[in-house]
C-alpha cells in the first residue's frame, strides 16, 4: 500500500460517538450504525459552520492498541471554537437530533496518509491489510476523511490518516 507522511493542523470536529472494539467484528456493526444515525437522523445537516462538505470517521480514546476498545466518532470539521460551542449548545440543549452531540480535537502532528477509492467494504479491507503492517503509531487519533467527490459510493475517494510517532 502506498502512503505519504504528512503534517496536519489541528481539526475541531462535531458529531456522535460510540465506544467499540475490533473483537468479533463488533466495530463493523457499531460504525455502520453510527454512520446511519449521523446521516439518517439529519445530524450532519444540522451542524452549522462546517469547514467543508467532507465527513470524518475518527478513531480516538484508544485503551491500548487496535485490539483494545476505542471510540469511533462520525463527524465533520467546523470552522472555529465558536462554531463548536454554538453547535454543542443548540443541538444538545434543544435535543434537536435526539442524540448526544460531542466535540473532539484531532491533534496537529505527523500522520501516514493513504488514499483509497471505494465504499465501506474497501475501507474495511484497508484496515485489515493495514493491521498487518508495521507502523510506530501514536494511538491518539486516526481518521478517515470522505472527500464527497461523487454520489457513487463505490467510487468515493477516502483519505485515511494514521497518527505516527
Model regions: which residues?
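A solvent-exposed interaction/effector surface
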Residues: 1-165
Amino acid at each position: 500500500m502506498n502512503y505519504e507522511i504528512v503534517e496536519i493542523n489541528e481539526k475541531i470536529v462535531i458529531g456522535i460517538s460510540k465506544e467499540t472494539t475490533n473483537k468479533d467484528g463488533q466495530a463493523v456493526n457499531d460504525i455502520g450504525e453510527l454512520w446511519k444515525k449521523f446521516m439518517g437522523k439529519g445530524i450532519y445537516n444540522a451542524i452549522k459552520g462546517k469547514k467543508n462538505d467532507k465527513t470524518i470517521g475518527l478513531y480516538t480514546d484508544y485503551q491500548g492498541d487496535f485490539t483494545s476498545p476505542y471510540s469511533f466518532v462520525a463527524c465533520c470539521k467546523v470552522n472555529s471554537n465558536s462554531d463548536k460551542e454554538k453547535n454543542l449548545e443548540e443541538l444538545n440543549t434543544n435535543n434537536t437530533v435526539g442524540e448526544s452531540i460531542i466535540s473532539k480535537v484531532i491533534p496537529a502532528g505527523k500522520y501516514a496518509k493513504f488514499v483509497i477509492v471505494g465504499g465501506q467494504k474497501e475501507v474495511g479491507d484497508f484496515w485489515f491489510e493495514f493491521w498487518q503492517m508495521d507502523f510506530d503509531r501514536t494511538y491518539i487519533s486516526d481518521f478517515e476523511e470522505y472527500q464527497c467527490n461523487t454520489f457513487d459510493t463505490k467510487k468515493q475517494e477516502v483519505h485515511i490518516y494514521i497518527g505516527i510517532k
